[in-house]
């Protein structure tokens, strides 16, 4: 392993419409096969339809949905003396956002609506109201961490 300096993370340019770095990251996570303009179109259409349905600001709904999906703790496998323990660890802020966005996109892809924009809008509206598949995923992760609280002293 080279002993040179650690290279910092690349800066993501904010999205052109709302000037939000978080939204730009979300577009990148949604993007398939490098088709960024398609991903942007899907996200903006979803945000517009969400704002229309709820009457709130585009970014406010998006932020609220993300906040309700962000995990506080997760479990990591740790091998101790021949057996593997699921050790609960706190999630770093950058990873919190990444996981929340990934879970939102996964949940939206599994929904039954016609277009991806409709699925994404429905999932984000559900998440902003603290329901839906993405929120359930977060609850499952928290439940798993809570169940393995006894192994918290194995943290590294």
Swiss-Prot record:
InterPro entries listed in its UniProt record: Ribosomal_uS7 (IPR000235), Ribosomal_uS7_bac/org-type (IPR005717), Ribosomal_uS7_CS (IPR020606), Ribosomal_uS7_dom (IPR023798), Ribosomal_uS7_dom_sf (IPR036823)
Pfam families the UniProt entry points to: Ribosomal_S7
Cellular component, GO, one term: small ribosomal subunit
GO MF annotations, alphabetized: rRNA binding; structural constituent of ribosome; tRNA binding
Keyword hit for Ribosomal protein: yes
UniProt entry tagged with the keyword Ribosomal protein: yes
Protein's job: One of the primary rRNA binding proteins, it binds directly to 16S rRNA where it nucleates assembly of the head domain of the 30S subunit. Is located at the subunit interface close to the decoding center, probably blocks exit of the E-site tRNA.
HAMAP family, A to Z: Ribosomal_uS7_B
Protein name: Small ribosomal subunit protein uS7
Originating species: Vibrio campbellii (strain ATCC BAA-1116)
